[in-house]
Regions:
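N-terminal entrance/gating region of PLP-dependent enzymes' catalytic architecture
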Residues: 1-131
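Conserved beta-loop-alpha segment that forms the PLP phosphate-binding cup at the N-terminus of a helix
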Residues: 115, 119, 133-160
Length: 168
């Protein structure tokens, strides 16, 4: 795919996303397929040549979509569907187009400084002192692990990392 095709199909993708979210309520929350239904429809050998985007999109709609649990469905009550507001989806287009590596200031100064400013805004919004420090976890799982490790360290008077649970 070249950038001209990207533009054409990107617009179609945005239209697809709009239609999907507008009609999501009409879909079943969970897939109605049985285990192996999707797997058995996928060829055993990879294609020898690149497939046309039309075929890939058709496969997506006919093969993949029936096997999807719709996490953003209004009747899906598991976990936390908090990452797919229209603004988040649009932001993903920008970030995925650039594909920046934002792990250090040197690799992406703007991303680092934007993150710092947003954290300052969180502090203001939550009434925290500006000197307050913390970490925003990426999932409930890592947040729970972090909380458990923090509780362990507090209970062991900050010696758990060096001595372990049994002072060994």
């Amino acid at each position: 795919m070249d950038w001209e095709e990207y533009k054409k199909w990107g617009k179609k993708g945005i239209d697809w996303g709009y239609d999907y979210r507008k009609n999501l309520r009409k879909l079943p929350v969970r897939s109605q397929l049985n285990p192996g239904d999707v797997f058995n429809k996928i060829p055993n050998e990879p294609p020898e040549k690149p497939e046309k985007i039309e075929k890939i999109i058709n496969d997506f709609e006919q093969l993949i979509m029936p096997g999807i649990t719709h996490w953003q469905h209004p009747r899906f009550f598991s976990y936390f569907p908090s990452n797919a507001a229209p603004s988040s989806v649009l932001a993903e287009i920008f970030t995925n187009t650039m594909s920046p590596m934002c792990m250090l200031w040197q690799t992406s100064p703007a991303a680092t400084e934007l993150e710092e400013k947003i954290i300052d805004w969180f502090k203001i919004s939550l009434g925290l002192p500006m000197g307050f420090n913390g970490v925003i976890q990426d999932s409930a799982t890592s947040a729970t692990l972090s909380a458990v490790l923090t509780m362990r360290e507090k209970a062991l008077n900050r010696s758990g990392n060096q001595k372990g649970l049994f002072n060994q």
